[in-house]
């Protein structure tokens, strides 16, 4: 099957497909042409949770996460804008946030400059494991689903058995930021087709890459570590 115009232009760039690559998220996104991605999975290394909790002992209790490069809110907002640019019409952004981002409305600020992205769903990940917390202990993270205009579900979201509260044990040995593998693969299969391009600018342990390999999707992504 011949490459589409977007895929052909992508082949001319210095970007690795379907394999890990060491690259800053901003640089990676800037190299991707407009309107070629069906899905962008974005798991930023934000500090909202750590800053709210302020235990003062990050380096001893969460040393692996503590060592990860941190992203400012401005960088996250810019990368959401870049996601909007590279997404094709009706493509999706899957943005991971924590409860403090949801409670403070920070998740809306991340999308404030991306006027073509509409929030269409929210999935709670129940990690089945008690975490930190000065009050209620953290057992969840949230996956914000935004869709680029025009928004529609019929024919675009094909798996209607995904619950909005997803129970799946975390796998910290894989990567300190590892996200639920089964949910990731289900989501990729739900909103993309075989051969579509899935982008992950903060790939971490490359769980999205693995899900793309299992489902026959093309992966573009990288990380600094």
Predicted features along the sequence, with ranges:
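Core catalytic lobe of class I
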Residues: 1-222
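Conserved SAM/SAH-binding beta-strand->alpha-helix loop
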Residues: 225
């Amino acid at each position: 099957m011949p490459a589409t115009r977007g895929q052909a232009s992508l082949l001319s760039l210095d970007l690795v497909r379907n394999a890990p690559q060491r690259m800053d998220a901003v640089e990676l996104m800037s190299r991707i042409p407009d309107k070629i991605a069906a899905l962008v999975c974005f798991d930023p290394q934000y500090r909202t949770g750590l800053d709210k909790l302020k235990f003062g002992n990050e380096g001893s209790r969460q040393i692996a996460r503590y060592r990860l490069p941190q992203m400012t809110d401005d960088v996250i907002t810019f990368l959401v804008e870049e996601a909007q640019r590279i997404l094709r019409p009706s493509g999706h952004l899957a943005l991971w946030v924590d409860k403090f981002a949801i409670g403070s409305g920070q998740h809306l600020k991340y999308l404030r400059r991306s006027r073509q992205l509409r929030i269409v769903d929210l999935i709670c990940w129940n990690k089945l494991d008690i975490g930190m917390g000065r009050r209620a202990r953290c057992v969840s993270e949230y996956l914000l689903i935004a869709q680029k205009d025009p928004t529609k579900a019929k024919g675009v979201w094909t798996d209607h058995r995904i619950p909005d509260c997803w129970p799946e044990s975390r796998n910290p040995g894989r990567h300190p930021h590892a996200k639920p593998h089964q949910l990731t693969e289900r989501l990729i299969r739900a909103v993309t087709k075989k051969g579509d391009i899935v982008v992950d600018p903060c790939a971490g342990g490359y769980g999205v890459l693995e899900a793309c390999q299992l489902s026959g999707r093309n992966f573009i992504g990288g990380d600094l570590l």
